[in-house]
Each structure stands twice: as C-alpha cells, then as structure tokens.
Amino acid sequence: MKIDYYEALGVERTADDKVLKTAFRKLAMEYHPDRNPNNPEAERKFKEIGEAYETLKDPQKRAAYDRFGHAAFENGGMGGGFGNGFGGSGGFADIFEDIFGEMMGGGRRRSNGGRERGADLRYNMEVTLEEAYAGKTAQIRVPTSITCDECSGSGAKAGSQPTTCTMCSGSGRVRAAQGFFSVERTCPTCNGRGQIIKDPCGKCHGQGRVTQERSLSVNIPAGIEDGTRIRLSGEGEAGMRGGPSGDLYIFLSVKPHEFFQRDGSDLYCKVPISMTTAALGGQFEVSTLDGTQTRVKVPDGTQNGKQFRLKGKGMPVLRQAAVGDLYIQIDIETPQNLSKRQRELLEEFEKLSSQENSPKSAGFFSRMKEFFEGIGE
C-alpha cells in the first residue's frame, strides 16, 4: 500500500520547509539503522520518511504529489529524470548528509583538506560592584593551544611534508554503504585530517599545536551585570592544519556588595538612624559608587521603612548613557542599654504622649479593644 507522505512525516499538508526539515530530522534520528541494528521495521520506516522528505522538499514534486498523489510518479508521469528513487547522483544520501551529517561523525568537515576550526574557550572572571560600575581593563592569563612554531602547524618534522591520504584523497571523508543508500563517514585512516604524517614534529608530536599560557587584555565595560558574556573573536584555541582559531568567551560574575543590593540598573541599601533623628528630623551622609558623599535630609516624623530616592546614583546601563537610581530605606534603631536618666526621660515622654503623637498605634489598640468588647457582649 502506498504511504501518505505527510502522514509518514507526521505533518500537516500546509507544513512549510522548516517544519518538514525538523520532522524529518527527528524521525531520522529515531529510526536510523545505526540506532536500530537488525530491525527491519525501523529500516522500512527510515526508507519511508526519506522517500517522503525527498518528494515534499522539492516544490515541483510536492505540487505534483498534492495534485495527483503517487500517480504523478508512475509510468513516467512527470517526464524523464523526475523519479523519486534514491539513485546514485544526489538523492536521499545527499539529503541525509545536508540535514543529518553530524550523526555520522561529529559534523561536516570535508573538501577542506582536513582544516579544522579551533575550539572555543571559556574564562570565568569575578568583578566587584565598584568595577562593574566604573568598568576596567583586566589582564588575564589563559592556557590554550597555539600553532606550533616548529612545524608551522603542519605537524610534520622540519624538512618533511604530510602526504595526502590515499583512502579519502585528502577530503577526510569516505562514503560507506548503508543498506539502500550511502553516507559519508570520517576517514578511519587519517581520522578526518586528509593527510598522513609519517615523520611527526618532535615539539607537537604531529598535532600541529602546543599548549601555552597567553596573556590577554580584556576591556570590561561599565554597567555589566552578573552573567554578562564578552566574546573575543579568534582568541580561542588555534585551528588545526590551517583552520581558523576559535573564540574566547569571558563570563562575568559580580561579587555581592556589603552595602548595596542591585536590581538591574537600580541600587538599594538600608541606612540605620536613631529614634530621635526619626522623630525630630536630621540628616545623614551616604557614600555612592561614583565616589561622592551625598547628604540626605530626614524630615521629622519619619517612619521605619521610609524610602528615599537619589536620582542618577545607581548603576550605568551597559553601552548606554542612562543611569539608574539609588533607593535608601530607613531602618530606625530602638535604643538599647539605656542609662537611668535616659529611661526616666523616655518614661516622661511616654506620659506626655498623646494619640496625635502615635496615631497609627493609638488607633490600632482602640480598634482592638472595641473588637474584643464586642465579642463579650
């Protein structure tokens, strides 16, 4: 029985190219013969999804299939060269390589003489909040792989040259039969290099690279946040056999601050003041990250938790001219270890206090009294 190509891929008839490609890749992973050895059913399904995708990925074939179904491909219905088999030039093998090649050996590195891009590196750096505020230039030392200066990266001893691998003809890839189609694999003779080194370099032992610690200057811009990533292009490991270098990624973390807490570009802090300052009014000074001392006026009758805003005293916004604000929360301290005279004065103050001095507490206890008296009636 003929299969429905859309059902085979599990997609709607309106599916676009991206949906088709995603569906094919997912099913190809599930039913690939390498993952299902000696499983005829998986091989059958794998062939069906390959047939379906080869037809639907081609706009002309898809249009014909949508209009005529499988009849479009029978008895030469679409003219010469329009069959849906998986013949020698291209066909399903090429589809599989383009979409799914990494399953066959870790990515497509072919037709490049074995050149390989160097690995990316990660470097973790911790900065203070003050450094995050102002920015800085940091010197770091990174252990990495660099091109061997003895052999200039060839891996071969001075005076000798690598020879082209005869198994893959220098491509680093070989074709292997896989049931009804063929796929490319990494050449087992040269391990994908495309070259054979008979007389390796004594310094790098044929690798073309040596490990060395490098010193780099890193610009940390003002306003960076915890988790900010900085990319230094080409500062990763050196490539293999003439390949490009990888990149270096600096991952930044900001140390917790003793005084300030941060939320985006805004800063928050708590400032303790005495009970008398809160009641009578006064002022205090706070040090800000720009290095200045800012005087804050406290009005009389200030309550615990009162918040003051200092505009433009927060953190700079990364790569922008904007600056956040500083929010100061008042924390009123209750006096401790009172002297006899201090206690006498507070007791006298308590006797002279009225509801107007503490309207919230007086109102609260009055309402509480009324509540419990109402329960007893």
UniProtKB/Swiss-Prot annotation:
<dbReference type="GO" id="GO:0042026">
    <property type="term" value="P:protein refolding"/>
</dbReference>
<dbReference type="InterPro" id="IPR001305">
    <property type="entry name" value="HSP_DnaJ_Cys-rich_dom"/>
</dbReference>
<comment type="function">
    <text>Participates actively in the response to hyperosmotic and heat shock by preventing the aggregation of stress-denatured proteins and by disaggregating proteins, also in an autonomous, DnaK-independent fashion. Unfolded proteins bind initially to DnaJ; upon interaction with the DnaJ-bound protein, DnaK hydrolyzes its bound ATP, resulting in the formation of a stable complex. GrpE releases ADP from DnaK; ATP binding to DnaK triggers the release of the substrate protein, thus completing the reaction cycle.</text>
</comment>
<feature type="binding site">
    <location>
        <position position="148"/>
    </location>
    <ligand>
        <name>Zn(2+) 1</name>
    </ligand>
</feature>
<feature type="repeat" description="CXXCXGXG motif">
    <location>
        <begin position="201"/>
        <end position="208"/>
    </location>
</feature>
<dbReference type="Pfam" id="PF01556">
    <property type="entry name" value="DnaJ_C"/>
</dbReference>
<dbReference type="GO" id="GO:0005524">
    <property type="term" value="F:ATP binding"/>
</dbReference>
<feature type="repeat" description="CXXCXGXG motif">
    <location>
        <begin position="187"/>
        <end position="194"/>
    </location>
</feature>
<feature type="zinc finger region" description="CR-type">
    <location>
        <begin position="135"/>
        <end position="213"/>
    </location>
</feature>
<protein>
    <recommendedName>
        <fullName>Chaperone protein DnaJ</fullName>
    </recommendedName>
</protein>
<dbReference type="GO" id="GO:0005737">
    <property type="term" value="C:cytoplasm"/>
</dbReference>
<keyword id="KW-0862">Zinc</keyword>
<dbReference type="InterPro" id="IPR008971">
    <property type="entry name" value="HSP40/DnaJ_pept-bd"/>
</dbReference>
<feature type="binding site">
    <location>
        <position position="187"/>
    </location>
    <ligand>
        <name>Zn(2+) 2</name>
    </ligand>
</feature>
<feature type="repeat" description="CXXCXGXG motif">
    <location>
        <begin position="148"/>
        <end position="155"/>
    </location>
</feature>
<dbReference type="Pfam" id="PF00684">
    <property type="entry name" value="DnaJ_CXXCXGXG"/>
</dbReference>
<dbReference type="InterPro" id="IPR018253">
    <property type="entry name" value="DnaJ_domain_CS"/>
</dbReference>
<keyword id="KW-0677">Repeat</keyword>
<dbReference type="InterPro" id="IPR036410">
    <property type="entry name" value="HSP_DnaJ_Cys-rich_dom_sf"/>
</dbReference>
<feature type="binding site">
    <location>
        <position position="201"/>
    </location>
    <ligand>
        <name>Zn(2+) 1</name>
    </ligand>
</feature>
<dbReference type="GO" id="GO:0051082">
    <property type="term" value="F:unfolded protein binding"/>
</dbReference>
<dbReference type="GO" id="GO:0031072">
    <property type="term" value="F:heat shock protein binding"/>
</dbReference>
<dbReference type="Pfam" id="PF00226">
    <property type="entry name" value="DnaJ"/>
</dbReference>
<feature type="binding site">
    <location>
        <position position="151"/>
    </location>
    <ligand>
        <name>Zn(2+) 1</name>
    </ligand>
</feature>
<dbReference type="GO" id="GO:0006260">
    <property type="term" value="P:DNA replication"/>
</dbReference>
<comment type="similarity">
    <text>Belongs to the DnaJ family.</text>
</comment>
<feature type="binding site">
    <location>
        <position position="204"/>
    </location>
    <ligand>
        <name>Zn(2+) 1</name>
    </ligand>
</feature>
<feature type="binding site">
    <location>
        <position position="190"/>
    </location>
    <ligand>
        <name>Zn(2+) 2</name>
    </ligand>
</feature>
<feature type="binding site">
    <location>
        <position position="165"/>
    </location>
    <ligand>
        <name>Zn(2+) 2</name>
    </ligand>
</feature>
<dbReference type="InterPro" id="IPR002939">
    <property type="entry name" value="DnaJ_C"/>
</dbReference>
<feature type="binding site">
    <location>
        <position position="168"/>
    </location>
    <ligand>
        <name>Zn(2+) 2</name>
    </ligand>
</feature>
<dbReference type="InterPro" id="IPR036869">
    <property type="entry name" value="J_dom_sf"/>
</dbReference>
<keyword id="KW-0235">DNA replication</keyword>
<keyword id="KW-0143">Chaperone</keyword>
<feature type="repeat" description="CXXCXGXG motif">
    <location>
        <begin position="165"/>
        <end position="172"/>
    </location>
</feature>
<keyword id="KW-0479">Metal-binding</keyword>
<dbReference type="GO" id="GO:0008270">
    <property type="term" value="F:zinc ion binding"/>
</dbReference>
<dbReference type="InterPro" id="IPR012724">
    <property type="entry name" value="DnaJ"/>
</dbReference>
<dbReference type="GO" id="GO:0009408">
    <property type="term" value="P:response to heat"/>
</dbReference>
<comment type="subunit">
    <text>Homodimer.</text>
</comment>
<feature type="domain" description="J">
    <location>
        <begin position="4"/>
        <end position="69"/>
    </location>
</feature>
<dbReference type="GO" id="GO:0051085">
    <property type="term" value="P:chaperone cofactor-dependent protein refolding"/>
</dbReference>
